[in-house]
Amino acid sequence: MGAKAPRGPKVAQWAMETAVIGVVVVLFVVTVAITCVLCCFSCDSRAQDPQGGPGRSFTVATFRQEASLFTGPVRHAQPVPSAQDFWTFM
């Protein structure tokens, strides 16, 4: 009468494989969702605005410094470089 091999390691290995596959599937779904959201923003930004200028784009950020609690209306902020200056610098 031979002793049977314990089933514990096989069950643990199956559970680990299932967990890894689940994590990969979740990461894939999240990646596809992020890609779809970015694609929607990209399609919206390609449309020209009514004034004939380029549409909004999520890839280029413009920064304006306005009066805030920290700067106050009296203290004038220095001009912020434009996005074109940034890309020229890069």
Curated annotation (Swiss-Prot):
Tissue expression per record: Highly expressed in lung, heart and skeletal muscle.
Membrane topology type: Single-pass membrane protein
Cell membrane recorded as keyword: no
Keywords noted in UniProt: Endosome, Lysosome, Membrane, Transmembrane, Transmembrane helix
InterPro entries given in the database record: SPAR
Localization per Swiss-Prot or TrEMBL: Late endosome membrane; Lysosome membrane
Membrane-side (Lumenal) residue stretches: 1-18
Parts of the chain on the Cytoplasmic side: 40-90
Protein name per the record: Small regulatory polypeptide of amino acid response
Gene this chain is encoded by: SPAAR
